[in-house]
Swiss-Prot record:
Binding site residues for Mg(2+): D19, D21, D182
Organism (species): Pseudomonas syringae pv. syringae (strain B728a)
SUPFAM superfamilies attached to this UniProt entry: HAD-like
Functional description taken from the UniProt entry: Specifically catalyzes the dephosphorylation of 2-phosphoglycolate. Is involved in the dissimilation of the intracellular 2-phosphoglycolate formed during the DNA repair of 3'-phosphoglycolate ends, a major class of DNA lesions induced by oxidative stress.
Keyword Repeat annotated: no
Cofactor: Mg(2+)
Protein name: Phosphoglycolate phosphatase
Pfam family, one: HAD_2
EC number(s) recorded for this UniProt protein: 3.1.3.18
Length: 272
């Protein structure tokens, strides 16, 4: 039985929100290159791929601090050093994504969901400036109507603010929404928003099995959400889902747009 059949009683959700790193793409090799470049410039021993794999998932500033501490616990890292390290890291990571790859089954699943008219959003803790170029390189951007970066809003996952914002934009209640991620912060954000969370077992969760976070379901291939699993021609009973038109297919939620939303809400509250 597919994930959708188990979680939504034979229907599709109206909205699916995805994490990026560790869920749709394996970006650790390029992140590790940038981290090691930063450490080398600061005269510190390089970390290596596996250490970086255990540190990712909470955004670039936290990743840099963990690398400087050589530990998940980064409380003792000097703020000035962290700022310097972050600047070097951001410069190094912006250069290219030579080693990042899309996980097996991701493109097929996104194509199928798009074909079925499901609204999709991307909510990542990756800094906004890196998201669009990476999606372009991986040829994934066209699938998402809403894209929210880690510094787009004042809060990032595990805070559920981005999930609430996207659900509001999509007109989708929590009962018809799904979050797909790979880490503790993803599961916590989904639970805080009242949304079911499907977790990928192959992602980044600081070396801990994601099942320990008690998501609604754990899968090892995104295609297992689909009825018939690997059958891309499968059909399923749909709730009343409106297929988005091509001209309104993508809305990148930038910091500038978010501030406009905040101001509009403030005006509405004042008038009320």
């Amino acid at each position: 039985m597919s994930g959708f059949e188990q979680l939504f009683a034979g229907k599709l959700p109206k909205l699916i929100m995805f994490d990026l790193d560790g869920t749709l793409v394996d970006s650790v090799p390029d992140l590790a290159v940038a981290v090691d470049t930063m450490l080398a410039e600061l005269g510190r021993p390089i970390a290596g791929l596996e250490s970086v794999r255990a540190w990712v998932g909470n955004g670039a500033p936290v990743l840099v601090r963990r690398a400087l501490a050589n530990n998940l616990d980064h409380s003792g890292v000097d703020d000035a050093l962290a700022e310097q390290g972050l600047e070097i890291f951001m410069r190094a990571y912006a250069q290219k994504h030579e080693f990042t790859v899309v996980y097996p089954g991701v493109r097929e699943t996104l194509k199928w969901l798009q074909k079925m008219g499901v609204e999709m959003a991307l909510i990542t803790n990756k800094p906004e400036r890196f998201v669009a170029p990476l999606l372009d390189e991986m040829k994934l951007g066209r699938f998402f109507r809403w894209i929210v970066g880690g510094d787009t809003m004042p809060q990032k996952k595990p805070d559920p603010a981005a999930l609430f914002f996207v659900m509001k934009m999509a007109g989708a209640p929590a009962s018809q929404s799904l979050f797909v991620g790979d880490s503790r912060s993803d599961v916590q954000a989904a639970k805080a928003a009242g949304v079911a969370c499907v977790a990928l077992s192959y992602g980044y969760n600081h070396g801990r099995p994601i099942a320990e976070e008690n998501p609604a379901m754990v899968i090892d291939d995104l295609r297992k959400l689909i009825p018939g699993c690997l059958d891309m021609d499968a059909e399923i009973l749909l709730p009343d889902i409106k297929r988005p038109s091509s001209r309104e297919s993508i809305v990148v939620v930038t910091r500038k747009l978010w501030m406009k939303v905040i101001k509009a809400l403030a005006r509405w509250r004042w008038r009320a």
